[in-house]
Curated annotation (Swiss-Prot):
Family membership: Belongs to the UPF0371 family.
Protein name: UPF0371 protein FN1121
Cystine crosslinks: none
Coiled coil regions in record: none
InterPro entries, sorted: DUF1846, DUF1846_C, DUF1846_N
Pfam entry (one): DUF1846_C
Gene3D superfamilies named among the record's database cross-references: dip2346 domain like, Domain of unknown function (DUF1846), C-terminal subdomain
Length: 506
């Protein structure tokens, strides 16, 4: 993989800049946008970026930091899913707490924003409190967004409980957008100033990158990633007017800035030090870019990947046609097409060959599916669905054989291992879908490795699949999707269901 980003330089630059901000105040509240951990989007568009870079920045400042996690009550009730991990927001809060503690970062509390007394929310709060985690309930802000006098009063932010903090830097994060991070920060500012403390507010958003051109693929990839939010990158007019400098921001921050500035000035009783939404940010990611062309190419691939993802989401009923059309427009606006993702053509060609073989045999029953992997050295490996295993499982085994320099005809897993598993699924468990998925095939390979040295060698190559690009001719089942993700394989799919069943194999 070609590198286009200097991770170490970024860590130094970012931690230094945050410290400079906090030095102006008794305390600094930082609203952390995007992913605090496992920022896979940033990793894909900035080759060389560490997906856990943000947590490493915080770790460098851990003696000065504590973390507040926000989650919107409505997202708990609706079981909103974090797309890149396939887990609900409430479960992602638990994951966040574990990860923060593992990195020696203090978790202050969890805030339920726009709180309403509903069953799922009540259960979530109980589970947190019984594990010794403080929970605060914050309500919808009275007067928001137009009545600043009510917002900044005991009837507005004053109705929320004050969160006791002890560190000079308070990071406010969440599982995803719309979780109430900004409202929590402003509520805390209100309470802090009422207590006579001089506190500040800043925002840490990785994207869009303010000092990269508006139409750069890196910034357009952010639009593709947030197409469901209808985010649009814009030149920051406030920054341009105040400093005569071009800076990129996005529509929601620019639209909210005049109100946000008024609220902060009302809370502090003095003129805001920020003259633009860009001023509020502490992001230094643009200074870590070392090869613009590498970043451009990676960002273009991400735009295509997002198009496929949105298409599958539309097919599954998880998004609307307008969102999919926006994703398609973004891809076409850069002159990109589906086939610019190399593995797409190979997967489709494999399916064509399989269909031709099926026609030759006059086989009308068999449902065919294929997948293609692009290995780190550019080699294309394919897999097909069979009665024994599904296409991703076959591609994984074929890839491991390639990485191990084994003959393609070699059977890595003995039929004596596979047949009892198939029998268990079909006869005992009475499963409707029999072929082994990625999890099952990897367990079978692990068992085989105990007595088969070749299987042991193949198993040792699994880590080399990280970063592999893949494309499936059919929408993958949840299990396969999750296991490919765990292996670090970036997979896209055509908008075609593998069967006509509505429940089985989805």
């Amino acid at each position: 993989m070609k590198i286009g980003f200097n991770h170490e330089k970024y860590l130094e630059e970012q931690s230094k800049y945050i410290l400079e901000r906090v030095n102006n105040h008794d305390k600094l509240y930082i609203e952390f946008g995007g992913k605090l951990l496992a920022d896979l989007h940033a990793k894909r568009v900035l080759p060389g970026f560490d997906e856990n870079a943000k947590i490493k920045v915080l770790n460098k400042l851990k003696d000065k930091i504590e973390v507040i996690i926000c989650v919107y009550a409505g997202d708990i009730e609706r079981n909103k899913i974090r797309g890149d991990f396939g887990i609900t927001y409430d479960m992602d809060v638990f994951r966040l707490i574990d990860d923060l503690r593992e990195n020696d970062l203090k978790v202050n509390s969890v805030v339920i924003t726009r709180y309403e007394d509903r069953p799922s929310t009540a259960l979530f709060i109980t589970r947190l409190e019984r594990r010794g985690i403080k929970v605060y309930r914050h309500f919808a802000t009275k007067g928001y967004p137009s009545d600043v006098d009510t917002i900044v009063s005991d009837e507005g932010y004053g109705k929320n409980a004050y969160i006791e903090t002890t560190k000079p830097i308070v990071v406010v994060t969440a599982p995803g957008p719309g979780s109430g991070k900004l409202a929590t920060c402003l509520s805390q500012l209100y309470h802090e100033y009422k207590r006579g403390k001089d506190v500040g507010y800043s925002k840490f958003e990785t994207f869009p990158v303010w000092n990269v051109p508006l139409k750069h693929p890196l910034n357009i990839a952010y639009e593709a990633a947030t197409v469901d939010l209808n985010d649009v990158n814009m030149i920051d007019p406030f920054h341009l007017e105040e400093y005569g400098e071009i800076a990129v921001n996005y529509n929601r921050d620019i639209e909210a800035f005049p109100l946000l500035k008024r609220i902060i000035e009302k809370i502090t009783g003095k003129k805001s030090i920020y003259q633009s939404p860009t001023d509020m940010g502490v992001n230094r990611v643009g200074f870590g870019i070392t090869d613009d062309e590498v970043v451009r190419k990676a960002s273009e691939q991400e735009i295509i990947r997002r198009y496929f993802k949105t298409g599958c989401d539309y097919k599954k009923g998880n998004t609307d046609l307008e969102t999919f059309k926006r994703s398609e427009f973004i891809m076409h606006s850069l002159g990109l097409k589906e086939e610019d993702r190399k593995v797409v053509t190979f997967a489709r060609k494999k399916l064509e060959l399989l269909n031709q073989e099926k026609d030759d045999k006059n086989d009308k029953q068999k449902t065919l599916s294929a997948i293609a992997f692009e290995m780190p050295d550019g080699k294309i490996i394919t897999g097909k669905k069979s009665s024994l295993m599904d296409a991703p499982s076959a591609a994984i085994l074929n890839s491991l054989k390639y990485l191990s320099n084994f003959d393609d005809e070699l059977l890595l897993i003995s039929p004596t291992i596979l047949e009892p598993i198939i029998k268990l699924k079909e006869k005992t468990l009475k499963n409707r879908y029999i072929p082994l998925d990625c999890e099952e095939i990897l367990i079978a390979l692990s068992i085989t490795a105990a007595t088969n040295p070749m299987a042991e060698v193949a198993l040792s190559k699994l880590s080399q699949l990280e970063g592999v690009q893949a494309h499936s001719t059919h929408i993958l089942g949840r299990n396969d999707e999750q296991y490919l993700r765990k292996l670090g394989i970036d997979v896209t799919s055509d908008q075609v269901f593998p069967t006509e069943n509505l429940y089985y194999n989805q």
